[in-house]
């Protein structure tokens, strides 16, 4: 038996192809994911950012076991998503992962109070058996998310931010290894969004829940240590954020962007790089001692650049 991956989320060469019908009635294949690779280790808080049509929603559907990939590898919380039966998928969604969706109607039952919504999640998942244990767990979760004042309120009586924080409490009621959030701030203003994201950071930090936020909003990346950009069905770049001390002992917040190199050596150049240099079809590469240079195909390669073991190119006479 192969060893289980030590990552909480692992995708290798993930492909998802949909068959759709064109206007003329012909069948057309649409490739939503094109060999996507992603690894998220236990306890990480990661944002996956991408424009509409980039493949991020398809990725989340696969990670939540609501959809199956066409090919590749997908593991979440120690479960192989490609081999699970339907009964195993139901158990996986109830016990191993938690969810926070953009729409309140998907997170909370409108006719139940905040405490009743959390208690219902506990009852469904089998956590905190017994009424007393459930009440204690409900109180703990609402206190953690700072919405204990909403305990007796129904969703229509709460603000958007309060609804989402209660939704997070519902999402972690089953003590999941992984929390998946789909556009959790999509319907909120900037200030409220920041409060909700800080609540997710608090859950990640205090409970150690591996958290993945899928969003189209680049501002979300300011609240996480790692941001993965998806473009054309693949991971294209990553931004890693850290806090360092300068020579005077003052804190500096540093963000470093990296291109993602896949297993066969492919990478996607950022759109602004491509546009700035007017890169098209072919580019020239040059191997330097400590980096690789990229030039537009119509420009001559700098003479100082060399490829190892490559014979000199002679211009035709």
Model regions and ranges:
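Conserved ABC transporter NBD signature motif
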Residues: 72-80
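Conserved ABC ATPase "signature" region
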Residues: 80, 119, 126, 131-150
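Conserved signature/switch motifs of ABC ATPase nucleotide-binding domains
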Residues: 94, 153-156, 173-174
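ABC ATPase C-loop
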Residues: 147, 151, 166, 171-172
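Catalytic Walker B motif of ABC-type/P-loop ATPase nucleotide-binding domains
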Residues: 179-182
């Amino acid at each position: 038996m192969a060893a289980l991956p030590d990552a909480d989320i692992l995708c290798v060469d993930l492909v998802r192809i949909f068959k759709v019908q064109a206007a003329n009635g012909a069948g057309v294949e649409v490739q939503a994911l094109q060999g996507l690779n992603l690894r998220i280790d236990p306890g990480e808080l990661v944002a996956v950012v991408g424009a509409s049509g980039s493949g991020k929603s398809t990725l989340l559907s696969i990670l939540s076991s609501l959809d199956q990939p066409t090919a590749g590898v997908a593991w979440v919380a120690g479960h192989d998503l490609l081999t699970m039966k339907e009964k195993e998928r139901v158990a996986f969604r109830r016990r191993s992962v938690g969810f926070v969706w953009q729409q309140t109607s998907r997170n909370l039952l409108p006719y139940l109070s905040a405490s009743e919504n959390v208690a219902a999640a506990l009852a469904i998942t089998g956590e905190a058996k017994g009424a007393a244990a459930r009440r204690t767990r409900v109180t703990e979760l609402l206190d953690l998310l700072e919405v204990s004042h909403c305990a007796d309120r129904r969703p229509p009586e709460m603000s958007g931010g309060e609804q989402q924080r209660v939704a997070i409490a519902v999402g972690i009621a089953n003590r999941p290894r992984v929390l998946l959030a789909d556009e959790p701030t999509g319907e909120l203003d900037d200030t409220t969004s920041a409060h909700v994201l800080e609540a997710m950071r608090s859950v990640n930090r205090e409970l150690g829940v591996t958290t993945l936020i899928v969003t189209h909003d680049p501002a979300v990346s300011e609240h996480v240590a790692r941001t993965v950009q998806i473009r054309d069905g693949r991971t294209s770049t990553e931004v890693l954020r850290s806090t360092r001390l300068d020579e005077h002992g003052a804190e500096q917040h540093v963000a470093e962007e990296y291109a993602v190199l896949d297993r066969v050596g492919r990478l996607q150049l950022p759109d602004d790089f491509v546009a700035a240099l007017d890169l098209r079809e072919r580019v020239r590469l040059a191997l330097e001692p400590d980096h690789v240079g990229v030039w537009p195909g119509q420009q001559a390669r700098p003479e100082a650049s060399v490829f190892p073991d490559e014979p000199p190119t002679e211009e035709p006479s």
